[in-house]
Amino acid sequence: VTNKLMGERVFRKIMGTGYPDSANVKAGSKAIKYHLDYMHWLLDQRRWLAGNELSLADFAAAAHLSCLDYVSDVDWNRSVIVKDWYAKIKSRPAFRSILADQISGFPQPSHYSDLDF
């Protein structure tokens, strides 16, 4: 998901390798919906993605979502449960440096670094 969306929309522009491949963008957009739905299902069953304790799985998934959120590719209205989970991860001190990152030529959306978005 991240490679299809970020690779096409961001990396191609940075590397100067042409315009985004619309088939890859479409596939990535479809895949993120599936993953958000699956995360919703997991978080409906437990507190965190891999169980009832915060784990590396949460940080890994949140890091990918952070990249996609930076370019506004996450529909946070799709799942309040996933949005609340992500807000909890964003509020962790260990995650703050990720939220401070910026990509030249790609302004972050106003909600990106807002912990209570």
PLM segments and residue spans:
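GST-like fold's C-terminal all-alpha helical module
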Residues: V1-S91
